[in-house]
């Protein structure tokens, strides 16, 4: 009798995706982040569902309802902080996952890579709208500043901003629609993640060596299920530690002040995971130029496959490209630091230099390094 997991229409899909999936035998811990992102997403959908049961999307009661969740709902504070800090974990895993893709040349699976970019943009939009919901000072002013960037679009900009706001300022209509979108988008992300996996399983996983692993595949279960469970336990350990010991470490104190349209906070800044893009935005004095740089800082990922000049897929045996990759990582950390600082003399120029370096590494230096390494290999 054939095993039911290989014949049942539903079980067959799960079996071919998570049990009998032929997987390269040499993939490292850098390949764990895909499953960790799945865990983060499920955790978010569950905690978000329970938060939505108690939250009210109204400007007069939103702030109070979040306080009520933390004070009066059984373990509401755990749910709220798991959701908020879970977002930080989500973005750490995302950056690691994208970084792994860049390092090992996974972007040459173009369909998987492009769906991944769409996923990244959707997750960023979802996180931004979620940050607006508690209706604190930083929620309100963050929403005002970021949505206002659309007014830089010629001709239709102002109309577009007012259409998104649902009025002439960020108000009740804005909050209500942001809540509606914040609720529905994670399910769209879940569907996109399935498409992401579908395209990945068409080609099979990449591996650290960058060469075909068809001659050496092992079943996903039990080898990588065990490995993924270890990753999940470490992720949850980090998240629970953060939630129980310093839940406000990554948040902004301004968000504990109810939103006040007539009082602007001293430094308006987004959550830490958007600071690198915010620094790039601020480093260009022109509004439209800044917005374009902000958008291109993410969309640049889409042209990475076109800029691949090396004969080798990954960077495992390419020391020059490795140096540039880690320089890029350091540059992104610098941008993250600058994004959280006030706009003052030495910091502005550091931000501008870091922004120029970011685009130069990706657009110019890495393709050149690939060509140099191709020629070096002939010696």
Swiss-Prot record:
Pfam families: Cytochrom_B_C, Cytochrome_B
GO BP annotations, alphabetical order: mitochondrial electron transport, ubiquinol to cytochrome c
Cofactor entry: heme b
Entry's Gene Ontology molecular function annotations: metal ion binding; ubiquinol-cytochrome-c reductase activity
Main localisation: mitochondrion
Subcellular location: Mitochondrion inner membrane
Binding site for heme b b562: 83, 182
Gene Ontology cellular component list: mitochondrial inner membrane; respiratory chain complex III
TM spans (from-to): 33-53, 77-98, 113-133, 178-198, 226-246, 288-308, 320-340, 347-367
Binding site for a ubiquinone: 201
CDD domains cross-referenced by the UniProt entry: cytochrome_b_C, Cytochrome_b_N
Domain of life: Eukaryota
Membrane topology: Multi-pass membrane protein
UniProt entry keywords in alphabetical sequence: Electron transport, Heme, Iron, Membrane, Metal-binding, Mitochondrion, Mitochondrion inner membrane, Respiratory chain, Transmembrane, Transmembrane helix, Transport, Ubiquinone
Residues binding heme b b566: 97, 196
Cofactor note: Binds 2 heme b groups non-covalently.
Miscellaneous information on this protein: Heme 1 (or BL or b562) is low-potential and absorbs at about 562 nm, and heme 2 (or BH or b566) is high-potential and absorbs at about 566 nm.
Family: Belongs to the cytochrome b family.
Function recorded in the entry: Component of the ubiquinol-cytochrome c reductase complex (complex III or cytochrome b-c1 complex) that is part of the mitochondrial respiratory chain. The b-c1 complex mediates electron transfer from ubiquinol to cytochrome c. Contributes to the generation of a proton gradient across the mitochondrial membrane that is then used for ATP synthesis.
Assembly information from the UniProt record: The cytochrome bc1 complex contains 11 subunits: 3 respiratory subunits (MT-CYB, CYC1 and UQCRFS1), 2 core proteins (UQCRC1 and UQCRC2) and 6 low-molecular weight proteins (UQCRH/QCR6, UQCRB/QCR7, UQCRQ/QCR8, UQCR10/QCR9, UQCR11/QCR10 and a cleavage product of UQCRFS1). This cytochrome bc1 complex then forms a dimer.
Protein name: Cytochrome b
């Amino acid at each position: 009798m054939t095993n039911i997991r290989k014949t049942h229409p539903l079980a067959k899909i799960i079996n071919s995706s998570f049990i009998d999936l032929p997987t390269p035998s040499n993939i490292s811990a850098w390949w764990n982040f895909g499953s960790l992102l799945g865990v983060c997403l499920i955790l978010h959908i569950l905690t978000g569902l329970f938060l939505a049961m108690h939250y009210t999307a109204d400007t007069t009661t939103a702030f109070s309802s979040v306080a009520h969740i933390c004070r009066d709902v059984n373990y509401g504070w755990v749910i709220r902080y798991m959701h908020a800090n879970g977002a930080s974990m989500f973005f750490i895993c995302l950056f690691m996952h994208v970084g792994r893709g860049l390092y090992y040349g996974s972007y040459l699976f173009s369909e998987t890579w492009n769906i991944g970019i769409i996923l990244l943009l959707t997750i960023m939009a979802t996180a931004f709208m979620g940050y607006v919901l508690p209706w604190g000072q930083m929620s309100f002013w963050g929403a005002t500043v970021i949505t206002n960037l659309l007014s830089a679009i010629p001709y239709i900009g102002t109309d577009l901003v007012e259409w998104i706001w649902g009025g002439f300022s960020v108000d009740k209509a804005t909050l209500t629609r942001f809540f509606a979108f914040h609720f529905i988008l994670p399910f769209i992300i879940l569907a996109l993640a399935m498409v992401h996996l579908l395209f990945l399983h068409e080609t099979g996983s990449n591996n650290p060596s960058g060469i075909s692993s068809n001659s050496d595949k092992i079943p996903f279960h039990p080898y990588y299920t065990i490995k993924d469970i270890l990753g999940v336990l470490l992720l949850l350990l980090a998240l629970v530690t953060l939630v129980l010991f310093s839940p406000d470490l990554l948040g902004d104190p301004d968000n504990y002040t109810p939103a006040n349209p007539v009082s602007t906070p001293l430094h308006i800044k987004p959550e830490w995971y958007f600071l690198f893009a915010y620094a790039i935005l601020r480093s260009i004095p022109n509004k439209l130029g800044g917005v374009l740089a902000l958008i291109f800082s993410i969309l640049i990922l889409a042209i990475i496959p076109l800029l691949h000049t090396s004969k080798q897929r990954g960077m495992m045996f390419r020391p020059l490209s490795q140096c540039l990759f880690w320089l890029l990582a350091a540059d992104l950390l610098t941008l993250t630091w600058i994004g959280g600082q006030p706009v003052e003399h030495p910091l502005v120029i550091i931000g501008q230099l870091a922004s120029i370096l970011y685009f130069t590494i990706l657009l110019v230096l890495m393709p050149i390094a690939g060509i140099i390494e191709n020629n070096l290999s002939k010696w």
